[in-house]
A protein has these predicted regions:
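Short, Lys/Arg-enriched anionic-surface-contact patches
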Residues: 21-49, 73
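Short, amphipathic alpha-helical "recognition" segments used to contact nucleic acids or chromatin
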Residues: 46-62
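Short Lys/Arg-enriched helix C-cap and helix-to-coil transition segments
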Residues: 89-110
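Short, charged/polar micro-motifs that form catalytic or ligand-binding hotspots
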Residues: 39-43, 57, 68
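General nucleic-acid-binding
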Residues: 1-23
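Short alpha-helical "recognition helix" segments of helix-turn-helix
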Residues: 65-70, 74
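DNA major-groove recognition helix of helix-turn-helix
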Residues: 57, 82-83, 89
Length: 110
């Protein structure tokens, strides 16, 4: 039963993040693209991936292990991605804009 709810949460967050990323970058991002590629992935996909993992970890309390299983990444890579988003949300305009729009769409607040 827990997997069912986690899957619903993953689908909702990933689709909202992709929509918000498209809004600011004008490039289509699809949820199935978020976890493809290991190196040299395009910026818009990297931003969407990091922000979605950050929200799933910090707002929904999902463990790094759960996130790594979903994303086919190592636990360490997921940790780095979450930390990167946590820092860039406060320092990078693109991350800020996408994050703030996503939070307002998901939770109705800024």
């Amino acid at each position: 039963m827990e997997d069912y709810f986690y899957n619903k949460i993953f689908i909702r967050v990933e689709s909202v993040i992709c929509m918000c990323t498209k809004h600011f970058t004008k490039i289509d991002v699809h949820p199935q693209e978020l976890y493809y590629g290991i190196t040299k992935i395009p910026t818009h996909i990297s931003v969407a991936r990091c922000i979605s993992l950050n929200i799933l970890h910090n707002y929904y309390g999902m463990s790094y292990k759960t996130l790594s299983d979903r994303s086919n990444m190592t636990d360490k890579s997921v940790m780095k991605c979450v930390a990167k988003a946590r820092e860039y949300i406060h320092t990078d305009k693109l991350y800020q804009d996408i994050y703030n729009l996503a939070i307002s769409k998901l939770y109705g607040k800024s």
